[in-house]
Amino acid sequence: MSELRDTRLEKCQALSDLGQGPYALNFEPTHRMAALHEAHADLPNGEEREVTVSVAGRVMTRRVMGKLAFFTLADETGTIQLFLEKAGLEAQQEGWFKQITGLVDGGDWLGVSGTLRRTDRGELSVKVSDWRMLTKALQPLPDKWHGLADVEKRYRQRYLDLIVSPDSRETFRRRARLVSGIRRWLDQRDFLEIETPVLQSEPGGADARPFETHHNALDLPLTLRIATELHLKRLVVGGFERVYELGRIFRNEGVSTRHNPEFTSVEIYQAYSDYIGMMELTEQMVSAVCQEVCGSCQITYQDTEIDLSPPWRRATMHELVEEATGLDFNSFSSREAAAVAMTGKGLHAPELADSVGRLLNEAFEQAVETTLIQPTFVTDYPVEISPLARPHRSKPGLVERFELFIVGREHANAFSELTDPVDQRQRLEAQQARKAAGDLEAQGLDEDFVTALEVGMPPTGGLGIGIDRLVMLLTDSPSIRDVIAFPLLRPEPRAADAPAMG
């Protein structure tokens, strides 16, 4: 690799000696590749068109065959073949054919001008009459036929992955279309996007361990936000009846195929609605965006057909757990009785799950969650695990909350929001006690948020959707790292830190 790099550095010097230089300031293409193909789709095989075009891109392949050479030039939209003929180039400037075939390597950025021809086999080509080195690459490209075999290298050097993998490029195009589609859908329905703080003195809105930092000038301990919920609710109190934010969230948690410590979510709040209204909003928005991004609500994920056409299945947590395990958690009068029954069914009853409600959630996660393949709204959660949700209108001990599961993964979480400041204070104080007892994911007591509720928040439905998991679903990606351009990875050991060999 070092020898190859040295050779390319020598070519940089040769380009400079020729007065061209290896790093151009600019170039003005007349067309991008896709537009060029579209504009001249009517050119018959074997014919030329005396129109001069200019294109720019990266050299992906090159073949030199005596007095002829063929390069493949790629830009973001597609590729074009370059046809280089010694006689034609030498007529423009002596030595050009030797220079371009000798000094241009795969991976270089090149700008060319010329006329168009279509080969007898139907390939549109630019017959090059002028060329310019735009950027000389010092490193070679991966094998275009095999790409990057090392999965971790694809994540560490995403730029290489994007160069050689059309599938990876399409994943991030779909991600961009999904994000813009969600914003457009909400904006068209009078939702207003307002940015809330990333740096916070009291993290809240989720059960998660935050990243901690420090503001030097104010000598103030701060955390990165773990949710946007509490600030968006303050905006509802302030009179914004339809508000949302699509942005980055940070949670100091483990890394897996479903979790990245830095991820993207959209949180949506609608005054005068409830969790039933948010179910309708969720299935309407997700199905509409899926139709826009994928062209259909019927998709395939890891060889399984998924139908995102509404309406989606709705079932309570109690119903699903009883269906899967035979356990009726409404019949248990104590935590101990529930734990014994769970153990009898081969389920684990952890000590931290200190109530019947928490054990119900454990049973759901162990026995039900991964079986929910088609879109399913799981409703009516225990109050113990839902400190920000409104008490259920008819079921004591439960709250009006749902989570959306698809392909065995949670994709959304929503409430009829708790608007009673007295009840909210009591629940957050209970969370505070768990936090003081060592629960690093328990929420603290945000006094200003409780004060905001005392000013008065109207009945409100709230919803959060994980963007990364939704992108995974719509791009058939098995890992969250496949849909985050630059996922968090452990740094590679430096050469000096590597263990000695031998």
Swiss-Prot record:
InterPro entries in alphabetical order: Aa-tRNA-synt_II, aa-tRNA-synth_II, aa-tRNA-synth_II/BPL/LPL, Lys-tRNA-ligase_II, Lys-tRNA-ligase_II_N, Lys-tRNA-synth_II_C, NA-bd_OB-fold, NA-bd_OB_tRNA
Disulfide bonds listed in the record: none
Cofactor(s) the protein requires to work: Mg(2+)
GO cellular component, one term: cytosol
The keyword Phosphoprotein is annotated on this UniProt entry: no
Catalytic activity, as annotated: tRNA(Lys) + L-lysine + ATP = L-lysyl-tRNA(Lys) + AMP + diphosphate
Cellular compartments annotated: Cytoplasm
Enzyme Commission (EC) number: 6.1.1.6
Enzyme class, first EC level, given as a word: ligase
Record-linked Pfam families: tRNA-synt_2, tRNA_anti-codon
Molecular function GO terms recorded: ATP binding; lysine-tRNA ligase activity; magnesium ion binding; tRNA binding
Cofactor note: Binds 3 Mg(2+) ions per subunit.
Domain of life per record: Bacteria
Keyword terms of this UniProt record: Aminoacyl-tRNA synthetase, ATP-binding, Cytoplasm, Ligase, Magnesium, Metal-binding, Nucleotide-binding, Protein biosynthesis
Binding-site positions, Mg(2+) 1: 403, 410
Residues at which Mg(2+) 2 binds: 410
NCBIfam families, alphabetized: lysS_bact, PRK00484.1
Annotated PANTHER family: LYSINE--TRNA LIGASE, CHLOROPLASTIC_MITOCHONDRIAL, LYSYL-TRNA SYNTHETASE
Family in the record: Belongs to the class-II aminoacyl-tRNA synthetase family.
Name of the protein in question: Lysine--tRNA ligase
Lineage start: Bacteria, Bacillati, Cyanobacteriota, Cyanophyceae, Synechococcales
